[in-house]
């Protein structure tokens, strides 16, 4: 037997009918136990390498044990716990955290989000808006509805402030008791309209009360012309009719009506339109057929009044200049050794004061030449002395 076994090749079975029991190796079973206890997701161990020639009764018992072992291991494989999902990265992970999944350990992001939500809730409470804000884009979220509401509110407040300031300027509201307003130094930031400064514009009465002709009395013609022109200076219109005649005065009235219907005339600086009486007098001065002598006779009283007003203003300026000069002389201190300069200045000052006193005394003052006449229009001109 030993020889036959030695003559046989490796892996070859003998032809003998003797029962031969092959004992299986213990290594596969031990490995199966180790793997089965260490990992729940393991494959069942197959015994295809073990050959066992036993009796039928023993074989049936072994098969029952193998089936029960197979079922137990299969049940263990089906009851394995679910695999843990990998840690999410990027925006998808943030979405799962927001949707109730695993929380992301982002402390500062949560703090910033809470602050933004508090600020938005405050704005919504102030503005009375309703609705939820879509924060799916988080820091890139832009609430355009809220921005539009804020811009509209800001523009309305700015418009109200402008309207309020404009109303104050238009009505000329001033604080009572202010020193600047009492002294006449206070001024409005915005110039008042012409109607507030000059009243409603005087409109010409084109129809009049009755018709006038060349044969009518000069007083009647002058009164009707003054009424149609709405001119308060009736004496001036009467002198125009008396010097130029009824015909020329009526022609000027017709030209004035035509100019007024076409829009009127501006004054010299263009700040406002002339009144109908101003248009009438302007046409009178610019008519070639009317001589300068006639114009002087018509405006003699007005020119005389204007001259008197200028004369009174000049006298007031001269008196103010004399007071300033006296105050300046009292404040000066001359050196004792400089007798010449003191005497010269005193003599010149006395002459100047004497001339001022003469100018203040009577109306019969002599007219100075153009070279000798010095007119002081402002108190700052004292610096030249």
UniProtKB/Swiss-Prot annotation:
Subcellular location: Nucleus; Nucleus, Nucleoplasm; Nucleus, Cajal body; Cytoplasm
Motif (Nuclear localization signal): 71-74, 189-192
Single annotated GO MF: mRNA cap binding complex binding
A GO cellular-component term linked to this record: cytoplasm
Region (Necessary for interaction with CBP80): 2-320
Region (Disordered): 1-28, 75-101, 164-192, 335-385
Major subcellular location class: nucleus
Function: A phosphoprotein adapter involved in the XPO1-mediated U snRNA export from the nucleus. Bridge components required for U snRNA export, the cap binding complex (CBC)-bound snRNA on the one hand and the GTPase Ran in its active GTP-bound form together with the export receptor XPO1 on the other. Its phosphorylation in the nucleus is required for U snRNA export complex assembly and export, while its dephosphorylation in the cytoplasm causes export complex disassembly. It is recycled back to the nucleus via the importin alpha/beta heterodimeric import receptor.
Known partners and oligomeric status: Found in a U snRNA export complex with PHAX/RNUXA, NCBP1/CBP80, NCBP2/CBP20, RAN, XPO1 and m7G-capped RNA. Part of a precomplex with PHAX/RNUXA, NCBP1/CBP80, NCBP2/CBP20 and m7G-capped RNA. Interacts with NCBP1/CBP80. Found in a complex with snoRNA. Interacts with NCBP2/CBP20. Interacts with DDX39A; this interaction stimulates PHAX RNA binding activity.
Protein name: Phosphorylated adapter RNA export protein
């Amino acid at each position: 037997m030993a020889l036959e076994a030695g003559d046989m090749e490796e892996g070859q079975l003998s032809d003998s009918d003797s029962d031969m029991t092959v004992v299986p190796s213990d290594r596969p079973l031990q490995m199966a136990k180790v793997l089965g206890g260490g990992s729940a997701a393991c494959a069942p161990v197959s015994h295809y390498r073990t050959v066992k020639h036993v009796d039928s009764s023993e074989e049936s018992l072994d098969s029952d044990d193998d089936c029960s072992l197979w079922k137990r291991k299969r049940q263990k494989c089906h009851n394995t716990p679910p695999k843990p999902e990998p840690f999410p990265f990027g925006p998808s992970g943030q979405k799962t955290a927001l949707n109730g999944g695993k929380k992301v350990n982002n402390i500062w992001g949560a703090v910033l989000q809470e602050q933004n939500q508090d600020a938005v809730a405050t704005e919504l409470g102030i503005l009375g808006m309703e609705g939820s804000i879509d924060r799916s884009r988080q820091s890139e979220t832009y609430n355009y509805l809220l921005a539009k509401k804020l811009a509209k509110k800001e523009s309305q407040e700015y418009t109200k402030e402008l309207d309020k300031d404009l109303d104050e300027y238009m009505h000329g509201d001033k604080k009572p008791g202010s020193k600047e307003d009492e002294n006449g130094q206070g001024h409005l930031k915005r110039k008042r309209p012409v109607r507030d400064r000059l009243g409603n514009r005087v409109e010409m009465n084109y129809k009049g009360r009755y018709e006038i002709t060349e044969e009518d009395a000069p007083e009647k013609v002058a009164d009707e012309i003054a009424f149609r022109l709405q001119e308060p200076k009736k004496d001036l219109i009467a002198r125009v009719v008396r010097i130029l005649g009824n015909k020329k005065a009526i022609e000027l009235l017709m030209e004035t009506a035509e100019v007024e219907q076409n829009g009127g005339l501006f004054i010299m600086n263009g700040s406002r339109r002339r009144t109908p009486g101003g248009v009438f007098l302007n046409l009178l001065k610019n008519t070639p057929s009317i001589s300068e002598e006639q114009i002087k006779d018509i405006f003699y009283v007005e020119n005389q009044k204007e001259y008197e007003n200028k004369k009174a203003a000049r006298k007031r300026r001269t008196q103010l200049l004399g007071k300033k000069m006296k105050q300046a002389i009292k404040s000066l201190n001359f050196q004792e050794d400089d007798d010449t300069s003191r005497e010269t200045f005193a003599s010149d000052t006395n002459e100047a004061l004497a001339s001022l006193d003469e100018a203040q005394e009577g109306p019969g003052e002599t007219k100075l030449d153009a070279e000798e006449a010095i007119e002081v229009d402002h108190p700052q001109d004292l610096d030249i002395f």
